[in-house]
Amino acid sequence: MNKKAIPIGIENFERMIKEEYYYVDKSMLIEDILVNRAAVTLFTRPRRFGKTLNMSMLKYFFDIENKDKNRKLFENLKISGSKYMNEQGKYPVIFISLKDLKADTWEKCILEIKKTVSKIYREFQYITENMDEDDKNTYNSIKNRKNDIDLNTSIELLSDFLYEYYGNKVIILIDEYDSPIINALNNGYYNEAINFFQVFYSSALKTNDSLKYGILTGITRIIKEGIFSGLNNLYVNTVLSQDYAEYFGLLENEVTEMLDYFEIKYKMKEVRNWYNGYCFGDKQIYNPWSIVNYLKEKEVKAYWANVSGNILLENMLDHAGESVYIDLKKFTDGESIEKYISDGTTIKSLLNNDDEIWQLFLYSGYLTKSEEQIKRKEFSEQGYFTNTYNLKIPNREIRSYFGNIFINRFFGTEVKTDILIKALENGDKECEG
């Protein structure tokens, strides 16, 4: 019997199933979304933890186009036994990925946005057949990249057209919603990007009468940017949330089954040491990118860390003070440290506040909470509760990355070398004490 292929880099759900790659069944994510019925859901998880593949799965499940063909993709999955299969193929779906918006100027970014929106409009060209001339002209001007005025409301406009055509409300999927904003900060056009995406997102998700559900993925929880201001129906699910914890990354039993299938179950101990250790909600999670690459290479090494460079994190380290490096030393020594994690932040404030760096380390997958439960403290003078978590490095892969990349890179700059050496010396003294 031919074995299924190892799915390295496969993010299209249809291809995953039809071309018989090994697929870890995450289809009950669909049922949980339908049970919870949040109008708009934001999932934040680290890079390469299955966000795009899950979004692709949602597209193929809900999409009203090709619904009979798409139904076959789910025949052998857990969701096929759910009563919520009656929701399959019922809705028009707009799927927009923003993870490749990497332009170095705002002018180039706008061109990339136009290209992305144009591609989506071309996908639905058939709905123009029943439009009046005014609507058809508006549609075609956006499709042909000639309409700048309606660009920031183009997703809302498309959902209105789809609702009118099908008579069913629309599901909007936005993958890597924060990628263009982070890239804008790194390249000096943050204000222009924020002004655009505030309207782009809020028009599609907040004031949209044609919306059934909106689902977004990203890495950061940048609630305070104003992008989601007034969006009372937004549910934010992070690595700290209890719900949906099992759907991004791999559970222990899923990894065991994979290693057994590929006949290397005896390697489970070293796999656990290198790639386990993430605590999402109350679940222990393995890094899926590292697991599939390990299955291919049969060698323990840093797979995820070596391809998940984070320019924003590096910029933050460039601006960081001595206390950050002292804590980095403690983390590499295997300590867990209690840190405050805010409910939301602005991307721009990350560069100006050393305390914010730990939030980005956590959400980006370089740190995880320890198994100890949340410690909740009341700050009565401010009149609100804050969350503090015991954070730690999750596994040997990330510890090797801290040692070889985050710390060693600063020996290339004179200023940071002094800070780092001082921090390491102080850390050693504390250990001796």
Mark where each language-model region is.
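Phosphate-binding site recognition
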Residues: M1-G433
